[in-house]
């Protein structure tokens, strides 16, 4: 694509580097921003700057947060006896959108994948073991993707937790095999959590 402005070209290149956005969509966004009220563009720029400079990760569960503890871990009304283990932050958002789960979370930061060179030591698995030891929850719910990587990660963690008197369960397989949690519709996800099965 040929552009009449170097600044527009630079903006398009940066925006199109975002996932799911091609050059044409980036061009539409750039032209929209140029036509927008200057204050709106400034608010967007300020918001993006704050996002990079102020967002942190919850010290307890590794969810994104504005403070050292995320709003879920800091909420006294959440059931701390239930810890839902998820792959990433998108999964926390997906489960929260069901409005059915009232426990807390533990974000692993990925899944065990020898093919991609990701081992247990690169994930927040040891921290989960520490939490179980210190917090003594009643149940750990595995809400990981129904993939080989998800099953491998679940199996590895259950072996690490077998010495603790905690119930281990999997969300029901209403979530299609091979699918990622964040793309599962809210009704199916809510039912999968409600109808979770004990891990054997």
Swiss-Prot record:
Keyword Translocase recorded: no
PROSITE patterns assigned: RECR, TOPRIM
Signal peptide: none
UniProtKB keywords: DNA damage, DNA recombination, DNA repair, Metal-binding, Zinc, Zinc-finger
A Pfam family hit: RecR_ZnF
Toprim domain mapped to chain residues: 81-176
Cross-referenced Gene3D superfamilies: 3.30.60.80, 3.40.1360.10, RecR Domain 1 (1.10.8.420)
UniProt cross-references to SMART domains, sorted A to Z: TOPRIM
Tagged with keyword Electron transport: no
A GO term for molecular function: zinc ion binding
GO biological process: DNA recombination; DNA repair
Renumbered zinc finger spans (C4-type): 58-73
HAMAP family membership: RecR
Role this protein plays: May play a role in DNA repair. It seems to be involved in an RecBC-independent recombinational process of DNA repair. It may act with RecF and RecO.
Family per similarity comment: Belongs to the RecR family.
Name of the protein this chain belongs to: Recombination protein RecR
Source species of the chain: Amoebophilus asiaticus (strain 5a2)
């Amino acid at each position: 694509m040929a552009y009449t402005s170097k600044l527009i070209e630079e903006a398009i290149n940066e925006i199109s580097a975002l996932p799911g956005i091609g050059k044409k969509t980036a061009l539409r966004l750039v032209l929209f921003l140029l036509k927008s009220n200057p204050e709106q563009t400034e608010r967007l720029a300020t918001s993006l700057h704050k996002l990079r400079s102020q967002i942190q990760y919850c010290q307890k569960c590794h969810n994104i947060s504005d403070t050292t503890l995320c709003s879920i871990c800091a909420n006294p009304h959440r059931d701390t006896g239930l810890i839902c283990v998820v792959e990433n932050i998108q999964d926390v958002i997906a489960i929260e959108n069901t409005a059915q789960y009232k426990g807390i979370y533990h974000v692993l930061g990925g899944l065990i994948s020898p093919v991609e060179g990701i081992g247990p030591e690169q994930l927040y698995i040891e921290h989960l073991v520490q939490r179980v030891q210190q917090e003594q929850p009643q149940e750990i719910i595995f809400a990981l993707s129904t993939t080989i990587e998800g099953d491998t990660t679940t199996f590895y963690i259950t072996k690490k937790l077998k010495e603790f008197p905690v119930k281990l369960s999997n969300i029901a397989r209403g979530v299609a095999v091979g699918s990622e949690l964040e793309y599962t519709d809210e009704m199916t996800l809510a039912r999968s959590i409600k109808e979770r099965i004990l891990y054997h």
